[in-house]
Regions:
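Alpha-helical interaction/linker modules in multidomain eukaryotic proteins
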Residues: 1-122
Length: 122
């Protein structure tokens, strides 16, 4: 299991980067396909923390933090917001995985493993 897309302003963990450290306006040829994949992740945890956008001149409320998975990768819902709005940078390994896999496929074992992994790392 791997975690991707943590933003320090929301998730202050060792593996997180500050919003300002993420490259914006990245060119993704398959952006819609990647966005569809991210949106189809299975929710494995949710918080009551309401988060606002960190983007300049954007006062949008993103909502509560939800952690999604495909059974191997785990990502927070707010990274989907920034990917759609600003084409925020995602790791090449993650993008290649998405484009090869096409659609998330998860079973209960994967879901339980993802939940356990998240508990240990968040």
């Amino acid at each position: 299991m791997k975690i991707v897309g943590l933003i320090r302003e929301y998730d202050n963990k060792i593996t997180s980067k500050s919003y300002k450290e993420y490259k914006k306006n990245c060119l993704y040829i398959d952006k819609q396909e990647i966005l569809n994949y991210l949106n189809k992740g299975i929710s494995i945890a949710a918080t009551m923390n309401v988060v606002k956008s960190l983007a300049i001149n954007d006062n949008s409320i993103i909502g509560g933090i939800n952690y999604m998975t495909d059974g191997y990768w785990i990502w927070p819902n707010y990274i989907v917001y920034y990917f759609k709005k600003e084409s925020i940078e995602l790791p090449t390994e993650f993008i290649e995985y998405i484009l090869k896999k096409k659609l998330p496929c998860i079973n209960e074992i994967n879901k339980d493993e993802a939940i356990d992994f998240l508990k240990r790392n968040i």
